[in-house]
Amino acid sequence: MTTIRRSFAITGLLGLAVLMAGSAISAPKKGYIANIEALTERNQDFRRVLYTGKHMQLVVMTIRPGEDIGEEVHDSTDQFFRIEKGEGELRIDGVASRVRSDDAFIVPAGASHNVVNTGKAPLKLYTIYAPPEHRDGIVRATRAEAHATDAHFDGKTTE
C-alpha cells in the first residue's frame, strides 16, 4: 500500500472513530432557570409546558373565572401545585379545600382531583408533574383546546 493510500485509510478510520465517538457524547445539560412567579403571572394560556425532564415536568396554567382544570386521575404521576394569583377550590378524592395566592399542595398519584377558579380574576398557578404528563413544549390557549387535543408525554425531553 502506498504512503498516500495508507494515510488516507488511517485518516478515514480516525474520522469515522471521531464521528462515532461524537454521537455517543451528549451535550451538557442546561437545566431550566427562570423567575417562575413572573412567568406564571404573565401566562395567558390554559396550559403551557415550560420544561420537561426525564422524571419531572414544569407547567404554568391560567384558569379563567368559573372554569376548572377538569376532574382527572394520574395513576402513576404525583403533582405539585403552587397558586401565584387568585383563589379557588381544590378537590382531592371528593374533599374540597379553599386555595389562594401563595398556597401550595400536592396531589398523590392515583387520587382524583380538580382545581376550580371560584374568584373573579384568572387563577394563575404552576404545577410540577413527576414523572411528566404532557408532551414537551405543548401550549394550549383554552381548556377546550387542551381537552380536545390532549397530547400525553411521548418520552421526549426538553434537552
Q: Where do the PLM segments sit?
A:
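Short, conserved beta-strand element in jelly-roll/cupin
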Residues: 62-64, 73-90, 128
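Short histidine-centered beta-strand/loop micro-motifs
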Residues: 48-50, 61, 70-74, 116-118
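Short acidic-glycine-tyrosine-enriched beta hairpin
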Residues: 95-109
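Ligand-binding loop in jelly-roll beta-barrel domains
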Residues: 109-135
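Structural motif
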Residues: 80, 87-89, 96, 112, ...
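A short, N-terminal "cap"/entry segment at the start of jelly-roll beta-barrel domains
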Residues: 4-7, 16-57, 70, 136-159
